């Protein structure tokens, strides 16, 4: 009876429903568990990233107890705590954590955020785009890149924690950008469609080598090569190797490398050169547009109507306003 009464007092909620100041309880996937030390006093605490279908939230375990030693990443736990805010972002102060049992009837897939389309559908969209290209060298390079990376591409996210950091997120990012590119190329019809589409497909492909992800689309860490070189350098290396393997024209190889090399636009963001061809310029803005719209849509979904979101780091720490006038069922 005591257990039942307590559950009636503490709401069971999804992360997207959390409100500052309330106590909550529920089942959450632990995406990461990190032991840290406070700057003052040297006290140990745990940083958690909790996740469900509706989003992620940072969890804090300030008082480490024996029960917390069982907390492991990529597992589901029953968590109880209080929702608070730090620097404009919601956090969960974890008070209790327990392992799930068979009686809880937990399905791991119910906690994994994933793209709104199947990976097979999205991969087919990319393959169809390549099939309809005119330049044989670009087609050969892309088909080989897709062949090499297909298995991991089916579940890899586009980032560890920023835009499209979900299962199948990299495919989703690419296919959305391809839709944008198709419309843009219809307006600016002097652009070489094959180059634009190829840039879209290739620009983040090396994130598969930059990050280490499990099949749930959760990135545990960056690879050694990814940390030392980054996906832009890794990407242009792969284009060079595959381009020579398929005997592609050296100019085509160079143009594709330039597309990847310049798509972050600024040196401080990883691009040593700015776009020097219009297709590369367009690629940059397609990338930025899709990333920002993804993050804004996510913020709106997590924010009540006529209220502002928490501060979104990837959007220059802006708070996004939900005016409630968006297209429904989208």
PLM features per residue range, with description:
Residues 2-24:
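OB-fold nucleic-acid-binding modules
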Residues 28, 74, 177, 287:
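Divalent metal-coordination and catalytic microenvironments
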Residues 33-44, 55-109:
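OB-fold single-stranded nucleic acid-binding module
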Residues 47-52, 213:
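Short, acidic/hydrophobic/Gly-rich beta-strand patch recurrent on exposed beta strands
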Residues 105-225:
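Acidic/His-rich, divalent-metal-binding segments that scaffold phosphate/diphosphate chemistry
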Residues 162-164, 172, 183-303:
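Divalent metal-dependent catalytic cores for phosphoryl transfer on phosphate-bearing substrates
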Residues 284, 291, 308-317, 323-330:
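N-terminal intrinsically disordered, cationic/polar leader segments
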């Amino acid at each position: 009876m005591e257990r039942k009464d307590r559950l009636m007092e503490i709401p069971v909620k999804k992360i997207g429903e959390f409100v500052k100041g309330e106590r909550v309880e529920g089942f959450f996937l632990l995406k990461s568990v990190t032991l840290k030390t406070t700057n003052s006093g040297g006290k140990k605490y745990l940083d958690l990233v909790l996740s469900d279908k509706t989003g992620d939230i940072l969890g804090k375990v300030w008082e480490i107890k024996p029960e917390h030693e069982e907390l492991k990443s990529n597992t589901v736990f029953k968590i109880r705590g209080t929702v608070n805010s730090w620097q404009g972002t919601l956090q969960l102060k974890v008070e209790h954590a327990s392992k799930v049992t068979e009686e809880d009837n937990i399905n791991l897939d119910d906690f994994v955020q994933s793209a709104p389309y199947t990976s097979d559908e999205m991969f087919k969209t990319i393959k169809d785009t390549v099939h309809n290209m005119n330049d044989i060298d670009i087609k050969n390079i892309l088909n080989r890149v897709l062949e090499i990376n297909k298995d991991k591409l089916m579940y890899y996210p586009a980032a560890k924690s920023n835009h499209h950091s979900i299962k199948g997120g990299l495919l989703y990012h690419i296919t959305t950008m391809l839709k944008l590119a198709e419309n843009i190329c219809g307006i600016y019809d002097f652009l070489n469609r094959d180059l634009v589409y190829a840039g879209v497909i290739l620009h983040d492909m090396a994130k598969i080598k930059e990050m280490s992800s499990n099949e749930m689309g959760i990135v545990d860490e960056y690879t050694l090569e990814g940390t030392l070189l980054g996906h832009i350098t890794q990407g242009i290396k792969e284009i060079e190797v595959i381009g020579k393997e398929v005997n592609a024209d050296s100019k085509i190889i160079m143009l594709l490398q330039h597309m990847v090399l310049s798509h972050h636009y600024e040196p401080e963001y990883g691009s040593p050169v700015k776009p020097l061809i219009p297709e590369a310029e367009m690629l940059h803005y397609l990338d930025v547009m899709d990333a920002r719209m993804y993050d804004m849509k996510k913020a709106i979904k997590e924010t009540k109507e006529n209220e502002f979101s928490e501060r979104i780091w990837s959007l220059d720490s802006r708070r996004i306003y939900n005016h409630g006038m968006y297209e429904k069922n989208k």
